[in-house]
Amino acid sequence: MKSWQGSIRNCTFVEKIYLIQKAMSTLENIFAQKLLNVKAIKLQPEQPFTWASGWISPFYCDNRKTLAFPALRSFVKLELSRIVAEKYPEADAIAGVATGAIAQGALVADALGLPFAYVRSKPKDHGMTNLIEGDLQKGMKVVVIEDLISTGGSSLKAVEALRQHGCEVIGMVASYTYGFPVAEEAFKQANVELTTLTNYEAVVEVALQTGYIKQEHVELLHQWRANPSEWGK
């Protein structure tokens, strides 16, 4: 995504308004604004969060919060479903990555009238000890739904589980990605096509345009994204 700042610098006031409105009209920016509105995304450069991985981050995304808002929930369902229908009309089933994408995946499967399953991070330690919950058959063409992509590790682990089960993973659709190079390389190596509703660049762009953050915060966020494992240490 090209930065709006480079194009806007030498424009008239009216042209600036037009460029801002045009930038805000993309799906990535529309959804980014919606996430910011419900505080599903928090940008706190001066009071960073600690992720489960141990990374210190000025950025936190909780897409599960979208489930609490009916209109936003419907928006996510419709947009994810639209992408699956347009890009993967041959899909036989939808699989969600536990636990964050179970609800989103089920919503998409319901909208498209497709079977649904979800993939655990590890097999259950009781009962049938299933890793994949559902009724997926060998040879099925499956689209994976994920809520968030950071390093891509857990997402691609689910893909591998489905492949081991005998399914053909034809693509993954997620609500959000940080766009870390390590994730992009991992998806490339795993031969998995990834499509997302929004991304880091769109969120930062919208947050700056709407006054959620200041320009100096943008520089700090970019520093973090360039080296997230070491930032803040």
Task: Tell what function each PLM region has.
Residues V14-E15, A23:
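Acidic, Ala/Val/Gly-enriched low-complexity intrinsically disordered segments
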Residues P89-A98, V173:
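Short glycine-rich phosphate-binding loop at a beta-alpha junction
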Residues D92, M140, I170:
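Conserved acidic residues
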Residues G105-V143, T151-L156, T210:
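Short, glycine/charge-rich flexible loops or terminal/linker lids adjacent to PRPP-binding catalytic cores
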